[in-house]
Amino acid sequence: MDITQLLAFSTKNKASDLHLSAGLPPMIRVHGDVRRINVEALDHKQVHAMIYDIMNDAQRKHYEEFLEVDFSFELEGLARFRVNAFNQNRGAAAAFRTIPSRILTLEQLNCPRIFADLALKPRGLVLVTGPTGSGKSTTLAAMVNHLNENQYGHVLTIEDPIEFVHESKKCLVNQREVGRMTLSFANALRSALREDPDAVLVGEMRDLETIRLAMTAAETGHLVFGTLHTSSAAKTIDRIIDVFPSEEKEMVRAMLSESLVAVISQTLCKNKEGSGRVAAHEIMLGTPAVRNLIRENKVAQMYSAIQMGNGFGMQTLDQSLSELVKSNQITNAEARGKAKIPENFPG
């Protein structure tokens, strides 16, 4: 099997990921579970050749120098893939994340209605968080698409690598890939403020400078979408504040309390039939009460504020899981395994 056949097989079987690892057969992740493909094990030379076939010269050079590389790759008529090539103890390896060629709408993703409102906010910081593979990119792509279909403006995305490709509909959409079209997230964000954007998507807010620039952009009248690998709203606020030195923390709390629009923390659950996955969301909005908690460093009280903020559109993860159980989308056992307080789902 060549790489094209493996990726076609992976896509046909609705896999989210394909794994190549020297010394083992190829494997796919379907509905969260990793399964072996029933073919012979691949050796180092085979995996290395498969990876090199789809890299350009710059990517090969980066791989040789740093022993790993991120890039995106498209099989026309099939899908795009986000690729990380690396080395492991048996030899070459790579992980391919499938990026559907069609951007799903917020309705198709069964997102809460408030997501559509958040996508059309005139300014502020909207964060979508969760572990790797929790569907953050898919949710953000749907939000950007909703903006693109409903308002006129300029949307700038900064990604590593570019995942979903957006057509310019009502919005002009410019997508920039770190490493190919800009040197870093921070460089691109610094330039973004001079490029007349209405909305900026930051693929990953992973360092102090990027986080600072994203908050500045939100504070100066832009809508900024960003992602972090945190599992709850409270942990997201802590993570942002903790990046900064102690003498800046108070100022950062004040900035964040002014600019934060929402934190959406999501996790994927297996559906009841075992034929797919659905997202559960914790939603924290920048209400006056939440802004006050951020300013006064009372992060521990945020969970209660979210619990009591139903009227504003807020919900805890457990409240979201409970709705999914009630609507017969997931089992009680699946909810218990994902819940913040498992005792909420006895049985």
What are the roles of these predicted feature ranges?
Residues 1-347:
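Short, flexible helix-loop junctions that flank or precede catalytic/ligand sites
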